[in-house]
């Protein structure tokens, strides 16, 4: 049997980028599993992110849909990254799982 290869790591959508009083929904903060420092997070810059969810209406034979984004830069000292999505993630996804794909590769 063929060996399976891991194509993505899991992450959590924490929040939007924000200041004391203002939210910026264009930028989402993502916590990647197993990443604890900005140096470790550097590896994921430019990687593609997918938020996979199920909808009630079937489109083209599937109820599963995806919102795509990209890791843009690190955020803070705890290994959190900033990401932009083609369409902003809705606020109901705070705490939801996202997939950070290991491509495009820069190794």
Curated annotation (Swiss-Prot):
It comes from the Eukaryota. It is found in: Cytoplasm. GO terms for biological process: cytoplasmic translation; ribosomal large subunit biogenesis. There is a cross-link at residue 47 (Glycyl lysine isopeptide (Lys-Gly) (interchain with G-Cter in ubiquitin)). InterPro entries: Ribosomal_eL33, Ribosomal_eL33_CS, Ribosomal_eL33_sf, Transl_B-barrel_sf. GO terms for molecular function: structural constituent of ribosome. Its main location: cytoplasm. Pfam families: Ribosomal_L35Ae. Present with 65600 molecules/cell in log phase SD medium. Component of the large ribosomal subunit (LSU). Mature yeast ribosomes consist of a small (40S) and a large (60S) subunit. The 40S small subunit contains 1 molecule of ribosomal RNA (18S rRNA) and 33 different proteins (encoded by 57 genes). The large 60S subunit contains 3 rRNA molecules (25S, 5.8S and 5S rRNA) and 46 different proteins (encoded by 81 genes). Belongs to the eukaryotic ribosomal protein eL33 family. Component of the ribosome, a large ribonucleoprotein complex responsible for the synthesis of proteins in the cell. The small ribosomal subunit (SSU) binds messenger RNAs (mRNAs) and translates the encoded message by selecting cognate aminoacyl-transfer RNA (tRNA) molecules. The large subunit (LSU) contains the ribosomal catalytic site termed the peptidyl transferase center (PTC), which catalyzes the formation of peptide bonds, thereby polymerizing the amino acids delivered by tRNAs into a polypeptide chain. This is Large ribosomal subunit protein eL33B. It comes from Saccharomyces cerevisiae (strain ATCC 204508 / S288c).
């Amino acid at each position: 049997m063929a060996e399976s290869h891991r194509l993505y790591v899991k992450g959590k959508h924490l929040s939007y980028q924000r200041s004391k009083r203002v939210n910026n929904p264009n930028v989402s903060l993502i916590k990647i599993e197993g990443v604890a420092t900005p140096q470790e997070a550097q590896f994921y810059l430019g990687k593609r992110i997918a938020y996979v969810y199920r909808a009630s209406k079937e489109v083209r034979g599937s109820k599963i849909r995806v919102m795509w984004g990209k890791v843009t830069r690190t955020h803070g000292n705890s290994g959190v990254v900033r990401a932009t999505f083609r369409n902003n993630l809705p606020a109901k996804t705070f705490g939801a799982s996202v997939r950070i794909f290991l491509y495009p590769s820069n190794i």
